[in-house]
Amino acid sequence: MSFSPSIAGLSGPLSALSDALTTLHESAFARLGSVFLTRLPAAPLSAPYLVGFSAETAALLGLEPGLENDPGFAELFSGNLTREWPAEALPYASVYSGHQFGVWAGQLGDGRALGLGEVEHNGQRFELQLKGAGRTPYSRMGDGRAVLRSSIREYLCSEAMHHLGIPTTRALCVIGSDQPVRRETVETAAVVTRVAPSFVRFGHFEHFYSNDRTDALRALADHVIERFYPHCREADDPYLALLNEAVISTADLMVDWQAVGFCHGVMNTDNMSIVGLTIDYGPFGFMDGFDAGYICNHSDSQGRYAYKMQPQIAYWNLFCLAQGLLPLLGEKHEESVRGDKAIEDAQRVLGGFKNRFAPALERRMRAKLGLEIEREGDDGLVNRLFEVMHANRADFTLTFRNLARVSKHDASGDAPVRDLFLDRAAFDAWVNDYRARLSEETRDDAARAIAMNRVNPKFVLRNHLAETAIRRAKEKDFSEVERLAAILRRPFDEQPEHEAYAGLPPDWASSLEVSCSS
């Protein structure tokens, strides 16, 4: 079903936008039917205006540069125009369930997000979703709105993560408004247009499992297999193969997160993507000083989702997904043993998480240290570095970036990284072992530094950088949002003109707190 008739009413300067969006059509997920979703228009957003726009993401959708300047662009991506769409083309909120902070929360769902549809361009399909579009049947006690600060953070982090090479949802734009929204204080509303191949979560499978809807569970699994893992159809047990794909993509994602010091903050099962994307940017954080127990979410008082816990939590979440898939597993076995065999098969596949994650993280850490040749003792060298970093709260990003300056011959390049450690003697003891290890490498210092700088970013979205952009945006100055976005699109480049964005956080940054309140 094409949505083009519903937006063809756009006229004047917006006709180009209407033409560009003629490929917007009903998503394959929406075609699964009403048991999966509820259709409704977005809530009105008063006097919407553009805050941020990603030309890169627009290009994925086939949107030409300049369309964001059309007078009605903000009207469309605020959701305001959806009130004129026919009933069969209305946006939709999907229903799911899940475990939150380790506790079964029952039915959840898109409480403030609405799917617009799907765009196909250059052989790729992307779903569009408006986050902050108003109340839905799944909002529970929420108002369905997102606020400007959290919307800017999601926009910036979506783009930053993509350019770090980490699978993620993307962000097309942020639309702001002066419409008040009450949180701890009164803030203003905003809408982020998210873009992703799929927004299906572990929690979708948990929902239909918990409601004993095996028919819907099968339809959902078939949808994911058809769209993303068609090779699973050739397996002896296609649904077990789907679980295996989730194990692989989730393990790989955890390697990516841990390697850059990223902490998600709310790794509930309803915030886990079935296709291995980073999804639902809330109280996330890139750590500054290294702390293995770093907690980015002020609401996480027990540290369930601390940095060091993320791989373990990912495995736990996969266990919940496996449980949700159990009714579909083991169909190749005799009925009398099917249940037991399904559990055995699921446990075996889940065991692959550690086998995937641990070696991949070891390889990544060797790359971050510039160790091309694997040697016995490399793991110990990495672990001792983290111990010294933890004891000194040495900056995560700057430590790894500046290690590229260390020479295998002498201490002439040590200062930039050595100065990050209060206990210089402890660092010297480690770096001398590191230098000895580098002497076993065949690459020269220059070649090694180039390779290290390709995996150790100079620029990440530190909280204080986001906060500065947010404060200016609240004053209607959006230049810092776009400046920061541009810098984060080149995280591995030197960009000497932006050196201030790569430095240690200012003292005031230590007082910043992020929580689930957005």
Curated annotation (Swiss-Prot):
Role of this protein: Nucleotidyltransferase involved in the post-translational modification of proteins. It can catalyze the addition of adenosine monophosphate (AMP) or uridine monophosphate (UMP) to a protein, resulting in modifications known as AMPylation and UMPylation.
Protein name: Protein nucleotidyltransferase YdiU
Protein source organism: Paraburkholderia phytofirmans (strain DSM 17436 / LMG 22146 / PsJN)
Cofactor: Mg(2+); Mn(2+)
A family per Pfam: SelO
Family under the similarity heading: Belongs to the SELO family.
Key words, A-Z: ATP-binding, Magnesium, Manganese, Metal-binding, Nucleotide-binding, Nucleotidyltransferase, Transferase
Annotated spans, Disordered: 498-518
GO molecular function, one term: AMPylase activity
E.C. no: 2.7.7.-, 2.7.7.108
Chain sites annotated for binding ATP: G109, G111, R112, K131, D143, G144, R194, R201, D280
Domain of life of the native organism: Bacteria
Catalytic reactions of this protein: L-seryl-[protein] + ATP = 3-O-(5'-adenylyl)-L-seryl-[protein] + diphosphate; L-threonyl-[protein] + ATP = 3-O-(5'-adenylyl)-L-threonyl-[protein] + diphosphate; L-tyrosyl-[protein] + ATP = O-(5'-adenylyl)-L-tyrosyl-[protein] + diphosphate; L-histidyl-[protein] + UTP = N(tele)-(5'-uridylyl)-L-histidyl-[protein] + diphosphate
Enzyme active site: D270 (proton acceptor)
Positions with a binding annotation for Mg(2+): N271, D280
